[in-house]
């Protein structure tokens, strides 16, 4: 009987710990204090890396949004890491004021694409490195605001990603899941002094060697 009771309590504890974990961070994510950073004293050199694996349908729009920044063009470089893009897509990209790095791998991955780009660009390519997915869209003030954050002494940032489309039940569910994850695993973590969980896109770091 005692052995059964201990097993029961261990089972309850195993179920309770994840619930308490989620509840704790969800509770601390509720206060919505808005971080406001002062204007940056220095404009840093930035590079935006966009790994694009067979992303012909979305990469042009993403690249255009990444370029359309309220930030000095000479300090803001956009690099598309093209993995198996169509020739016509590559042609359209090369018409834009950005760098195209073509890569080919037996087994493609974002990590391999980013490593190849960093090796090609070198460690002194920029002071701020931004990683976007091929379908991430950013607004025109994005680079300015990220520079303000780094000017405050922060060396790594996970930006807030939101769903683009909410025109179907599945899209709404995906958007809700994104916001729940952002609240619990990012806002909640930061509120308790922990690092934000990473989502491998919209990440900003202070130099390429940190990749």
Name these PLM-found stretches.
Residues 1-42, 93:
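N-terminal membrane-anchoring/stem segments of glycan-assembly enzymes
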Residues 31-32, 69-71, 139:
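Catalytic cores of nucleotide-enabled group-transfer and carboxylate-activating enzymes in metabolic
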Residues 45-47, 77:
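Cell-envelope/extracellular polymer assembly enzymes that use nucleotide-activated donors
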Residues 60, 86-94, 141:
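Acidic helix N-cap motif at the loop->helix transition within catalytic regions
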Residues 64-75:
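Short, acidic, metal-binding catalytic loop of nucleotide-sugar glycosyltransferases
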Residues 79-90, 104-107, 137:
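A conserved acidic beta->alpha catalytic loop
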Residues 102-123, 140, 145-206, 210:
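Long helical/loop segments within the catalytic core of UDP-sugar-dependent glycosyltransferases
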Residues 125-137:
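Short beta-strand-to-loop acidic/aromatic patch adjacent to the donor-nucleotide binding site
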